[in-house]
Amino acid sequence: MKRFAIFAMMTTAFALSALAQRDETAAARVPLENYLKGHATGDGEYMKKAFHTEGNMIFVRDGKYETRSFAQYIAGMSGKPAADEAQRKRWIEKVEIVGNAGVGTIILDYPQGKFVDYMTLLKIGDEWKIVNKSFHFEPKQKPNQ
């Protein structure tokens, strides 16, 4: 009977831990979903919900390391969907979290090319935020090339 009680307690603890992790993963997806909505609509308010105010984009362009603040990125948004929005696809590929830190991978598949975004996530207080973003862009060849 003692073994059964120990087994039952361990099983319950494992199940509760798994449920808590699933809830936390769902919460960590919220800023990623806001990021996707920002791209779909061109509305910087979604990006403000997604990004931490002190975060940065980090990337390589023409072989050079570059950074851009999230504030600069948001300021460049048009406020309306892109003209080719109907041809654009975007999704959350993966989210991994441990404790209050995580990483999200997002795919932006656009007519001109494919972006792979790697988002560093932190839980600050009760809210998850994207604190840094790095990305790779792969241009698509035009049909005549």
List each language-model region with its residue ranges:
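Short beta-strand edge/turn micro-motifs at domain boundaries
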Residues: 114-141
